[in-house]
């Protein structure tokens, strides 16, 4: 299970991980799998974790937020839901937008030294999720580049280690969707 806590005092919900609806076949259980990370307390997060991706997308589309970190969680969850439903063009677009939003959040946090390292983890999530989508789209070079960036931002994060290992063994199927109570 991959968990992170956001230190802004906003939402703090326990994180869980589940096997996704697009899990690999039983024969592939021992091989490491790519992992998507969603924000359970972001728009659509609980539905994503329950494997109700269409319902999650509906909830996400209806959600309106004022805070930039809430928007980042929303668009990240949209990226994950589209990837899980194998709508790769939409997933790629959402992942790109989640990355832009996470970068903007990080730039705002750089004013506060303690917030910068936390934001690095959130930015690593955006890169790692986009890497999964790149692997699904059979673009391993772009995926490797994104995972290298994720590793440089959060070298000890479990989702980074798992995705790097999965890439090394050429396993590009999604086995898990993980939630973090970060936004």
What is each stretch, according to the model?
Residues 28-30, 64-69, 101-120:
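Flexible helix-coil transition and linker loops at the boundaries of alpha-helical arrays
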Residues 148-183:
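Terminal, low-structured helical/coil segments at or just beyond the last alpha-helical repeat
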Residues 36-58, 62-65:
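Alpha-helical segment of the N-proximal tetratricopeptide repeat
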């Amino acid at each position: 299970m991959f968990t992170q806590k956001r230190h802004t005092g906003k939402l703090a919900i326990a994180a869980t991980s589940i096997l996704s609806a697009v899990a690999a076949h039983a024969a592939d259980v021992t091989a490491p799998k790519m992992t998507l990370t969603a924000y359970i307390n972001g728009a659509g997060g609980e539905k994503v974790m329950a494997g109700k991706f269409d319902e999650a997308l509906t909830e996400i589309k209806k959600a309106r937020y004022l805070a930039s970190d809430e928007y980042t969680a929303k668009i990240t969850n949209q990226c994950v839901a589209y990837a899980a439903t194998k709508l790769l063009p939409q997933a790629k677009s959402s992942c790109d937008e989640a990355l832009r939003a996470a970068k903007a959040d990080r730039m705002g946090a750089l004013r506060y030294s303690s917030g910068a390292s936390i934001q690095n983890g959130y930015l690593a999530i955006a890169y790692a999720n986009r890497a999964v989508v790149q692997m699904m789209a059979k673009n391993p070079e772009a995926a490797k580049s994104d995972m290298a960036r994720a590793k440089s931002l959060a070298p000890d994060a479990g989702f980074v280690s798992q995705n790097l290992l999965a890439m090394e063994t050429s396993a590009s199927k999604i086995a898990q969707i993980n939630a973090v109570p970060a936004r």
